[in-house]
Design a protein with these regions (language model features):
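Conserved beta-strand-loop-beta-strand hairpin that lines the nucleotide-binding pocket
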Residues: 1-23, 67-141
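Histidine-centered phosphotransfer motif of kinases
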Residues: 55-73
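Conserved short strand/loop->alpha-helix "switch" segment adjacent to the catalytic nucleotide/phosphoryl-transfer site
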Residues: 34-61
Length: 141
């Protein structure tokens, strides 16, 4: 789908594009990681972006697991956003603590989540919210 198919209103000099955004509220339990991955996969299929499924589902799974492991959130929110260009993934939680990429010990079985995310995405970051934070990821085109 090209950008012209997404035009909703505006002029040729100042077009406004539709922004597709979907959220899924998730309980903070391990089994919900699969729900987050299925949610992202279904949106990418609906948008015809099947080339992004593998990386996106790995990333959202890592974001979910990091939030589950490092926060005491009562609820997590996975979001996927597309405006006809790049795909943006988000994970919202109740903690104000921002993630960081720690030195990786490849002998251990855990501790590589943000390292994996950084390797698969174009850019990632986080922002504080009124009650917690959002960790966001932009996928390469």
């Amino acid at each position: 789908m090209d950008r012209s198919e997404l035009a909703k209103y505006g002029t040729s000099q100042h077009p406004q594009y539709v922004r597709y955004r979907h959220e899924r509220h998730l309980p903070p339990v391990k089994a919900a990681a699969g729900t987050a991955r299925d949610f992202v996969e279904s949106r990418l299929r609906a948008w015809g972006r099947t080339d992004q499924i593998e990386d996106a589902t790995v990333i959202i799974g890592e974001l979910f697991n990091n939030a589950l492991l490092h926060t005491d959130s009562k609820e997590l929110v996975a979001a996927i956003d597309w405006n006809g260009g790049r795909i943006r993934l988000e994970m919202w939680d109740d903690s104000p603590d921002r993630p960081r990429i720690a030195p990786v010990d490849f002998e251990k079985e855990s501790g590589r989540g943000m390292y994996i995310i950084a390797a698969l995405c174009e850019i990632w970051g986080s922002r504080l919210a009124a009650s917690g934070k959002c960790v966001w990821v932009i996928l390469p085109e």
